[in-house]
Amino acid sequence: MINLMKQGLGHRTPQQEAVPWGRKFSRMDNFWPRDGSCPLRFSERIERAKMIQKHELPILEYDSNSEEVIRPNHGAEQLKLPEKCVYAFLGEAVDDYAFEAEATVAETFETITRNYPVYIVKQDGMEFCLCAAPLGAPAAAQLMDFLISCGCKKIISTGSCGVLTDLAENEFLIPVKALRDEGTSYHYLPASRYIELNKNIRDAIEHTLLVQNIPFQECVTWTTDGFFRETQDMVRYRGAEGCTTVEMECAALAACARKRGASFGQILYTADSLANIDAHDERDWGKGSLRKALELCIAVLQTI
């Protein structure tokens, strides 16, 4: 079980208490490496501090130093997951499929909200990881970062999106780039307005949909943290900029994957409509696409 709530991250080891140089260990003074070596000396700390790109707005500040205090695989250093992964915003449909496929549970990622089983599926000569994704960029990126750190390097995600134009429900879309209107991606990559998704994975998704004779469109998606702050003027503005869909994770997941050296792509299916800003249409939230979207992700993995 991976439980970040129970790891005792605030306690120092006896080795840290006995710091050389004749003084107490301090979080503000030194970082004690995991290999037991000496803390960073003052000159080294100064050099690392230079890696922080500072800005008046905190969201635009970025630390290019990849040595995090808490590594993504914290507590599961020995876990080795398959290279291929389906990471799906499909709720119980993921667990249902895992049960039908007689999947095994390699690990359980625990959070205060719910636990996420990490399934291993063996199907048609392929072994892949299957995991349900939590709603929202911070939670989704945290779990995907964990999966990558444990071995997943080719990740196909799927989930619903709202539409800003006149698109029918349950249509499939392939995001080419995502507008970074969330906060999480800025912790993985320096600031930019958009992030492009991996072309090789996009091509594999397009090939799979073409082979199965499934209509699709490419799209520019608007990734936002503010579900209830999709204002009328902002919807118009994003639409004028070229965004045709809105969701809450794509930009963050693409940034996380790029930072960690993984390949990531996503299949979106249309749910509610914001095309008429005076009358939001929930429709059926794209529920008719859940199973097909999951099957398409698995089919894409067969080609990469």
Task: Label the model's feature ranges.
Residues 48-195, 199-203:
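Metabolite-binding pocket within alpha/beta catalytic cores that recognizes anionic/polar moieties
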Residues 148-149, 239, 258:
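Non-catalytic positions within long, well-ordered alpha-helices that form the structural scaffold/packing
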Residues 251-285:
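Zn-dependent metallopeptidase/amidohydrolase metal-coordination segment
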Residues 274-304:
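His/Asp/Glu-rich mid-to-C-terminal helical/loop segments that flank catalytic regions of hydrolases
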Residues 195-240:
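Active-site rim beta-loop-alpha module in soluble metabolic enzymes
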